[in-house]
């Protein structure tokens, strides 16, 4: 068979979050489908109607399809991954990033322009990607605690739809982060990671597999591997004042890790023990509150359509060419 028309069309489950990114998906469904080359996919389209719905859709329907494509923000991708993994389904994942920040898309090199992202999926090129596990719940790129980490899920959806990324800036810095920094309260935590132990007062912590967190903190691409079985553990020790907190934010963005007040470690398993229940954020969504958090890396747990990228250690075999 030498032509697209002679090839079997692949069955694609398209999960659409109609509220993502200024309601772009709600208004432009036909544009989304038309972005793909003709004759490549047979689409079944399912809309999410509430938080957690993409988990249910992926879990209940994905095994009937050759691939799953999610259209929305990082939270929609998170739910899609959770649904696939809970069902034990290993079909490749396509991502059309239409959220307000799209941190993971930036890391993976997935275009934010719809047609380019669709063409990438149609090309068939995938990479094996590490997924995080937090007390049995999967996350695609970051788990974190501390001031400012609630910004994404505390920002009203209407504000996100109206202002996009600017909504995070307004809600984050003026309505949430500044008041939080005015009342800096470190947590006393015991941290075990890969056979090592830390115990001290900490202000912030994250466990991530990304070059960008919340669109604000940037890590050097040379420090990150997306499929090496390790995530990056970032810890900020107790700070003396709100002014010191702003200085620390600046140091994080400059990647000035001194190993004392600002700790940067690669690890495959981390256990946090808090004296009081602590709220966690997973991929920008509320991850619950608990005194003990067990984090681990699930090495190359999913296959995601993405371009060749030096942050991937392994060369993934290309899916059967579709165009």
Q: Language-model segments: which ranges?
A:
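Gly/Ser/Thr-rich active-site loops/lids in small-molecule metabolic enzymes
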Residues: 159-168, 212, 216, 221-241
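ATP/nucleoside-binding phosphotransfer catalytic cores, i.e., glycine-rich phosphate-binding loops
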Residues: 2, 193-194, 199, 225, ...
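Short Gly/Thr/Asp-enriched flexible loops that form oxyanion-binding sites at enzyme active sites
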Residues: 76-88
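Catalytic core of DAGKc-family lipid kinases
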Residues: 48, 86-203, 207
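Short conserved active-site loop signatures built around small residues
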Residues: 54, 74, 205
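Short hydrophobic-aromatic micro-motifs
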Residues: 137-146, 150, 199-209, 213-214, ...
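ATP/NTP phosphate-donor binding region
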Residues: 1-71, 311, 318-323
